[in-house]
Amino acid sequence: MKQQVLDCFAKLFGGEGDIRTYFAPGRVNLIGEHTDYNGGHVFPCALTIGTYMAARKREDRKLRFYSMNFEKLGVVESSLDEFQMGKEGNWTAYPKGMMWAFCQKGFPVEQGFDIVLYGNIPNGSGLSSSASVETVTGVMLRDMFGYDTISMIDIALYGQFSENNYNGVNCGIMDQFAIAMGKKDCAIFLDTSDLKYEYAPVKLEGARIVISCSNKKRGLGDSKYNERRSECETALAEIQKVKDIKSLGELTEEEFEAVKDAIKDPVRQKRAKHAVYENQRTVQAVAALKANDIAKFGELMNASHVSPVSYTHLRAH
């Protein structure tokens, strides 16, 4: 695939100069849904499919983007002087958002780029194609400008920062972290409250994880994602009036049941219950996987898939 992206780049922008290629994977979350913005645990892993990029630095501040996935859009032209927060209107919002984020974090992007992208992540499938674009852009910028002090965790945080502030999606850290820190044959057991993590080998003897497509398109920006997060934040504020906690992820199931009546709205109570119970399921699922108890791991995954429908009114994608 890399060669096809390079061939496309040469056809559009010429094959001369320092053209560099990059790749960032997609991700799937095995368990831990709607917990990352509630200070809980998640258990994602990177995929072999992802986003390929060919890029060449320019001498001016012009930006030229082309996606092999959106051929009808043609070459999208912009510049480093034309950041339009929340108003880009197409896929270039993600690489431009990362360029903006680098600038905001003290790492100037002072030269433009010619960029060709191709992703073999199905768009809107819930496998984090947008976070993959953000991450591959961050890796490219770090390399092109020699910003060696930027770590992969920094790139994940910059991706979340750009998603929150440039694209207006109040996402947690899971997608970008899983993509930036993914490791072959492992999932990442991540505590989103402090970013402590460990790699857990995924060795399923006699079993296989299958990612299936429901044919329901999903995009964080046009889903109920921001609304669900706001509901959880309000529920947390209500609980904090009776219990000293910083996030819903700190609560056990028993502790939640003891304080749940502090949440005045029954819908918000459902949202918070899911966050707390799902966090506990995630911890239990990782323990089951480590013990090679695949049946228990599967039971917890099934419960994880049911809970968002019952308590957050969201469907699997």
PLM ranges: what are they?
Residues 1-127, 131, 135-152, 161, ...:
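ATP-binding N-lobe of GHMP and related small-molecule kinases
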Residues 48, 93, 154-157, 227-234:
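A general alpha-helical scaffold signature found inside nucleotide-binding enzyme cores
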Residues 100, 157, 287:
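Surface-exposed charge patches
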Residues 153-163, 297-302:
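Short, well-structured alpha-helical segments that form the helix of a local strand-helix-strand
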Residues 1-27, 52-88, 186-315:
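C-terminal nucleotide
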